[in-house]
Amino acid sequence: MTLKIGGIVPIVRVMRDTIIQRPVSTFVRYHSKRSRSFKKKANHKPGQVIRSKLGKTLEAPKTQPKLFSFGNFSGLDQPENKLKEMSSNAIKNITSFESLRIFPTVRSAMLEEIKYGYNLKSTYIKSKEELEIKPSPVQIAAIRKINQPRLRNVNAEKKLADKKASGQEILEDLQKSNEMNRLKIFTIAAETGSGKTWAYLAPLLSKLKEEDMRVFNMSEQSYADAKKTSIIRSVILLPTHELVEQVYDSLKRASKASIDLEASVNKKILQDPQYARYLSLPENQTSLNLNVVKWGSGDSHQKLFDAGRKRIDVLVTTPAKIQGLAKLNNVSRPFRLFNFVEYCVVDEADTLMDKSWIVDTTSVIRRLSKCKDLIFCSATIPKEFKKTLGKMFPDEFSIINIVTPSLHKIPKQINLKVIDAQLSPYNGSKTRCLAQALYAIHNDGTEQGYVKRILVFVNEKRDVQPLADTLIEKFGHREEDIIGITGADNADDRLAKIEPFLKPAELLEEDLDGSKVKVLITTDLLARGLNFNGIKNVILMDLPNTSVDLVHRVGRTGRMRQSGRVFVIIDKKTGKSWIKGLPKVIKKGIPLG
């Protein structure tokens, strides 16, 4: 006897005393007309009581979440429901950054930086001062977990009637010391464009400021000496120099953001003796005053050593740059600045932990012997990434996983359309299909008065320039409007080319090129983490190779709850029947597998 319940096909075995339902598949399959059809659905619903032939009853199990999973589009790991539920409950109860444990001046600087990057176009808000910034789900979940005190009630008075033996006191002191210094590993996974950067920056900067305040309140001289030490306190690792620039710019703006203590910090905090003394320092009156250093493409090792003559609070770089120090045969102890790093963030971890990067990334991590917090942050959790972490840290309880309920789901505010190049008038030409899509976007009446920016993704870098040339020569696009980028371009050229796409859209009359539409053609090189400010349209010229790539490409639009459109162009070779089900998958909120 076979039933189909809620999209799951279970096998039902009628035994003497019980009914056993064994799930066979939790995947959603989209079949072509020629594929075999399933048997008609039974009327049983999840949670319904089923009566057996012998009169025994058993409640039907609730169905597991459906997945959109096919072939190479099945490489994503699905977190346990319990983990998502825990995160969901916390998210429901918190609606303000004031409810989160963030150092007061860090909170103020963070809000100013978030407002700076907010796109007011197409909103009713006239100025950024009117914005009410609320934490996103991933920010709530991550800040709560990472900023939890390592020791609770450390300063509470002992309530034991009898004085403890000296041996017991020594043991407790050792246990406290171990707890304060042991390595804690966090993974942060949330949908693209959800605010993950500040999900790890807020705890990181808070810990740095709290440590400064602790040292200052112990001894002003110790605090002054600590600021002169030649060390790096924290490191943020990123896969590309574009991302290094992006994260560094956010940190620099936050570090230099103007802070009005009276206006932005709670009066109770200002009256707290430990905060009052530290915040009264002139250096804390107007900004975070943190030393943030970028070590990017083209920067010599000497730049790092020069910056390290005074304490570096945050270093933003790539794993390859740090590992490059090993080649300096004429420099004594080239890694000496990293001996006291206490906090390390591996951003875009699904990339930095794949086979192309893992050797450099893990080599850097191994050098951080004093690290207390190691944070892996990503928009996806590939199965291979989870296996790699399991090998690195065999004790599963040593890893604290932080996920959001919408992980691996394409945001519903993204409108995805599949265009079949086999149909008339394209007649099998994907390039003609692309040209028509660009024309339609240009004339659709949206973003009036602004230069429209469009991202086009292809799978191979060898296709970038030929496609750009075809759009210019055959379809009449201006050369200054079609921009192609590959890994062959040096980092400075890439930054110059993508600048119009990273900043808010310009008014038509202010664009120096006189452009009405700008098109950026690239590969997955630029699909990871970059915040393309206010981009409304993304075109996938080629079907991505995996669901990981699909999530990242689509995630260049629809960021921070803003709307976006994605056009997927298919032909006879890539026009699988299941790909046409993607729009429904998004509308129904089904995660990718």
Curated annotation (Swiss-Prot):
Q: Does the keyword Nucleotide-binding apply?
A: yes
Keywords from the named record: ATP-binding, Helicase, Hydrolase, Mitochondrion, Nucleotide-binding, RNA-binding, Transit peptide
Task: Return the broad EC class.
Answer: hydrolase
Q: What is its main location?
A: mitochondrion
Recorded catalytic activity of this chain's protein: ATP + H2O = ADP + phosphate + H(+)
Q: Where in the numbering of this chain does the Helicase C-terminal domain appear?
A: 433-593
- EC code(s) of this entry: 3.6.4.13
Q: Which CDD domains match?
A: DEADc_MRH4 (cd17965), SF2_C_DEAD (cd18787)
The residue ranges crossing the membrane are none
Q: Does the keyword Hydrolase apply?
A: yes
The protein's matches in Pfam families, at most eight in alphabetical order, are given as: DEAD, Helicase_C
Q: Any idea where the Helicase ATP-binding domain is?
A: 177-399
Which superkingdom is the protein from?
A: Eukaryota
| A GO CC term attached to the entry | mitochondrion
| Function (record text) | ATP-binding RNA helicase involved in mitochondrial RNA metabolism. Required for maintenance of mitochondrial DNA.
Family, similarity comment: Belongs to the DEAD box helicase family. MRH4 subfamily.
What is the name of the protein in this document? Answer: ATP-dependent RNA helicase MRH4, mitochondrial
Record organism: Debaryomyces hansenii (strain ATCC 36239 / CBS 767 / BCRC 21394 / JCM 1990 / NBRC 0083 / IGC 2968)
